[in-house]
């Protein structure tokens, strides 16, 4: 019997406010609704899905470190840490778990300081501007990548 593949979904600062915060940029769905949809999608594919949202950079880094040897793929919306966190980049590189970077809004159509990501050049893929559906696309891509490895 093969062990289930595990995918970790990480969400950075202020994403706990989804549904309330700037719905024109981020949509009206709450993070809980987005994660529930992802859990259903993962369950149908026989994938174990874990989720963490944190406003604290170190908690996201610790989750990445703890994922080493236990998680097969990471989906991360680093939110504002996208543009500032060399530490998140180093953590992801350190564990060498493939990851997809997700953003609800099109960061390239927003303020110039949002255009740079410390993660994009190391990600397997980047999805931005597709709202909550971007997470579903990322999960589908991660599942396909894991199935291709088997």
Swiss-Prot record:
Binding locations of substrate: 77, 83, 90, 104-105, 114
Catalytic residues in the record: 26, 103
Name listed for the protein in its UniProt record: 3-dehydroquinate dehydratase
UniProt function note: Catalyzes a trans-dehydration via an enolate intermediate.
Example GO molecular function: 3-dehydroquinate dehydratase activity
Keywords assigned by UniProt, alphabetized: Amino-acid biosynthesis, Aromatic amino acid biosynthesis, Lyase
Gene Ontology biological process: amino acid biosynthetic process; aromatic amino acid family biosynthetic process; chorismate biosynthetic process; quinate catabolic process
Catalytic EC class: lyase
Xref: PANTHER family: CATABOLIC 3-DEHYDROQUINASE
Organism of provenance: Vibrio cholerae serotype O1 (strain ATCC 39541 / Classical Ogawa 395 / O395)
Pathway annotation: Metabolic intermediate biosynthesis; chorismate biosynthesis; chorismate from D-erythrose 4-phosphate and phosphoenolpyruvate: step 3/7
EC number: 4.2.1.10
Domain of life: Bacteria
Gene that encodes the chain: aroQ
Keyword Lyase: yes
Family stated for the protein in its record: Belongs to the type-II 3-dehydroquinase family.
Matching InterPro entries: DHquinase_II, DHquinase_II_CS, DHquinase_II_sf
Site (Transition state stabilizer): 21
SUPFAM superfamilies membership: Type II 3-dehydroquinate dehydratase
Subunit comment: Homododecamer.
Reaction equations catalysed: 3-dehydroquinate = 3-dehydroshikimate + H2O
């Amino acid at each position: 019997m093969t062990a289930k593949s595990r995918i970790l979904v990480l969400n950075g600062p202020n994403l706990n406010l989804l549904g309330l915060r700037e719905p024109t940029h981020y949509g009206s769905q709450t993070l809980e609704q987005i994660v529930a949809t992802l859990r259903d999608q993962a369950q149908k594919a026989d994938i174990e899905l874990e989720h963490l949202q944190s406003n604290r950079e170190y908690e996201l880094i610790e989750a990445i470190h703890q994922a080493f040897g236990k998680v097969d793929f990471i989906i991360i919306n680093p939110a504002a840490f996208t543009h500032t966190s060399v530490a998140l980049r180093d953590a992801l590189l350190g564990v060498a778990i493939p990851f997809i970077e997700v953003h609800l809004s099109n960061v390239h159509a927003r303020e110039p300081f949002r255009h740079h990501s410390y993660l994009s050049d190391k990600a397997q893929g980047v999805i931005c501007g597709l709202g909550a559906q971007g997470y579903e696309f990322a999960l589908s891509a991660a599942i396909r990548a894991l199935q291709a490895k088997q």
